Amino acid sequence: MANPLYQKHIISINDLSREDLELVLATAAKLKANPQPELLKHKVIASCFFEASTRTRLSFETSMHRLGASVVGFSDSANTSLGKKGETLADTISVISTYVDAIVMRHPQEGAARLATEFSGGVPVLNAGDGANQHPTQTLLDLFTIQETQGRLENLNVAMVGDLKYGRTVHSLTQALAKFSGNRFYFIAPDALAMPQYILDMLDEKGIAWSLHSAIDDVMAEVDILYMTRVQKERLDPSEYANVKAQFVLRAADLEGARANMKVLHPLPRIDEITTDVDKTPHAWYFQQAGNGIFARQALLALVLNSELAL
């Protein structure tokens, strides 16, 4: 059966309907249960990381290899013509698109991934993070993990903690969960790092409940998912970073009173916002969450590069 994601650019989580999300998650579950090492055997995929990455880059490239694709690209733009010779992003993408079947791209500038689609010659571009804007594939693995642990994506109480202003993962995840009914959001952040108004306006327009809080303890007993984020030092001036970095820290003792099946998620890397004693609790699920990135990204690559997919 033809699939709606074939040859589609995936730049924002809003490029995917609820039905698209459900298709990706169902495909991820099938690939987790039954690996397909030759599914992309004759495909070449570019992995273009203009910004530092560990989990996203390695997860994407592992996904490509495990599906049998050939992988080309770079993890540091400083040694490319763009970095050394001043080539434009448009020209870089125009050239790369003549070599490959798909482009996975991370870039520090908001909107760079969308710009790349204008110069890719129809070759699908998958956004692996563009500045503080969007991180759709992180959201796919987040949704996959939530569905696995909670058994649903509806009627959830979800708390998001930390840097909600620059944290692209929380922007994308909120927009995705807003496509499913009955979810409620609790936003816990310093005033300087509050959730952007456009996200709150979107929730209001959809009639989705949300509230602002000043402490994790305020909501611990109510939530199904506690989504922690780090304060992003690279996006703040030093004085602002010093003021907010330790404001919201989760310790094992804080989990007393949490629901039995509540899971703590984190897009990683963590710095100081989750102490290591949390790792030993049954609530900690961030390492399993990271592992699910393989299956979510495999699913997306498989769907974007196959007009028909029967697993």
Swiss-Prot record:
L-aspartate binds at K85, R168, R230. It catalyses: carbamoyl phosphate + L-aspartate = N-carbamoyl-L-aspartate + phosphate + H(+). Keywords: Pyrimidine biosynthesis, Transferase. Carbamoyl phosphate binds at R55, T56, R106, H135, Q138, L268, P269. Its EC number is 2.1.3.2. One of its GO terms (cellular component) is cytosol. SUPFAM superfamilies: Aspartate/ornithine carbamoyltransferase. GO terms for biological process: 'de novo' pyrimidine nucleobase biosynthetic process; 'de novo' UMP biosynthetic process; amino acid metabolic process. GO terms for molecular function: amino acid binding; aspartate carbamoyltransferase activity. Pfam families: OTCace (PF00185), OTCace_N (PF02729). The keyword Transferase applies. The keyword Chaperone does not apply. Transmembrane segments: none annotated. Heterododecamer (2C3:3R2) of six catalytic PyrB chains organized as two trimers (C3), and six regulatory PyrI chains organized as three dimers (R2). Belongs to the aspartate/ornithine carbamoyltransferase superfamily. ATCase family. Catalyzes the condensation of carbamoyl phosphate and aspartate to form carbamoyl aspartate and inorganic phosphate, the committed step in the de novo pyrimidine nucleotide biosynthesis pathway. NCBIfam families: asp_carb_tr, PRK00856.1. This is Aspartate carbamoyltransferase catalytic subunit. It comes from Klebsiella pneumoniae (strain 342). The lineage of its organism: Bacteria, Pseudomonadati, Pseudomonadota, Gammaproteobacteria, Enterobacterales. The gene is pyrB.
